[in-house]
Amino acid sequence: MKQWPVKALFGKLLKVNHIFIMKRRIILCAAVLMAAVANTFACTNLIVGKNASADGSTIVSYSADSYGLFGELYHYPAATYPKGTMLKVYEWDTGKYLGEIEQARQTYNVVGNMNEYQVTIGETTFGGRPELADSTGIIDYGSLIYIGLQRSRTAREVIKIMTDLVQQYGYYSEGESFTIADPNEIWIMEMIGKGPGIRGAVWVAVRVPDDCISAHANQSRIHQFDMNDKENCMYSPDVVSFAREKGYFNGVNKDFSFSLAYAPLDFGARRFCEARVWSYFNKFTDNGKDYLPYIEGKTNTPMPLFVKPKHKLSVQDVKDMMRDHYEGTPLDISNDFGAGPYKTPYRLSPLNFKVDGQEYFNERPISTQQSGFVFVAQMRAHKPDPIGGVLWFGVDDANMAVFTPVYCCATKVPVCYTRVDGADYITFSWNSAFWIFNWVSNMVYPRYDLMIGDVREAQKEMETTFNNAQEGIEEMAAKLLAKDKNAAVDFLTNYTNMTAQSTFDTWKQLGTFLIVKYNDGVVKRVKDGQFERNSIGQPAGVMRPGYPKEFLQEYVKQTGDRYLVK
């Protein structure tokens, strides 16, 4: 087994941090340190209430899946502005200038999709009725996220800020589901415009119970909601009346379904979107079989918005779920002909295709090759904000990403998570984590089951090290925080940067290792992390894996006697 240098790198990290702390006259025992110690978006959000998590955290995840999206870690430093300052708004997807709005007098530090008060926002686009889009609006869904994070201290405050913004300036985007979370509660808010030239939006927000899990994945999921439960439900005053006016609904209020009115279900919404929610529910409840007929189109009875899990989920459980390809379920795509000889659980886009006039489809799992970035956000009410909020962040496909800890107080993001050297979606850089992780994953995709084991070893070693180090690092940060907040923030910023850089360096080494080991379709022999040599010092003989028996049988069936040895 190849030994990745994470422990050496982590030792370097601890040494640097120790020096950092010594400068502030805090003496720590080295033994304690070592004991502590690694197009339209098509996205997925997973949700875990604080009483459904193993450690009392609220947990939400987000994969930003889009061809064209460069994976980077955004940063908006805290700032103050004079009264009357204007903020230019650019569409997140395209960079198109949309207009100006009044800037807040005070904004908060935002790193990625979490702010310094542990408030986190994710999203998935459901589109909905196309006639409701308003191209005259100034606020797009991406701007709502990052402006909302810069101005809020709680999830409820975000909801008010976001809905006030679209009411005042107009909503530019399609229908959107937002996950809005803080250390105490998680909300799902769904929003759609009112049509060209009509300012504002119709929306509803529902609080996820603390003991439940939930998810959304590019299809509106809020059906009926309790209009009298002001503590757990918020909505625009015209959410029902507007649907009646447009002819989308003609029943009584209690029967109103936001989803059916504004985002009617079709095949793609069911199979490509709701199926990802089903996979999550199937994994962590005993009710997956009950919901499968809905995914297969045999019933129109929707899945519940939230469910109670059969056991409490850890942050690592959610990280692993973001790597899901329906393995072991009726929707598993790793064992049919489309998986090829090496059982790849990926399918190239487009999802739909035609053969002889008949339309077919490929499954769309949670983990997908076109992810720009992915995160699992951990928010904890029992810890101070600078320590309690951790954005476990990775770039590219979650299946082959490494989630590194990014603390919400960080005042500087790792260089490898930026547009270093001018890197973007069409500009490669050897110093960009997005491109290094894509380099590795695109080597693995064609020979998946031959190569994924090497990726898993490195991935597991990194993530296990970071997980095991978390408690000790946070104890150190808490001691600093008690004496000097700036010192604690600097320490966690330094830790955030060094873990990302060590991961980046390791992945570069992994890439070179994979090229050597699997070059030209053979496999080099490895022993104790080193490539083997023979008795005279030359490279040992290679292994020729060939093709699996099942693939060869299908190959002969397709080609007949063409390749028969006679």
Language-model features, listed with the residues they occupy:
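Sec-dependent N-terminal signal peptides
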Residues: 27-33
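Histidine-centered catalytic/metal-binding microenvironments
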Residues: 458-566
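Bacterial N-terminal signal peptides that target proteins for export
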Residues: 4-9, 13-27
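Sec/Tat signal peptide C-region and signal peptidase I cleavage site
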Residues: 34-42
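Glycine-rich, aromatic-lined ligand/substrate-binding cores of catalytic
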Residues: 242-394
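Substrate-recognition/cap regions that form aromatic- and gly/pro-loop-enriched pockets
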Residues: 341-479
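A contiguous strand-loop segment
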Residues: 43-141, 161-313
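Short, well-ordered beta-strand elements within core beta-sheets of diverse protein domains
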Residues: 145-151
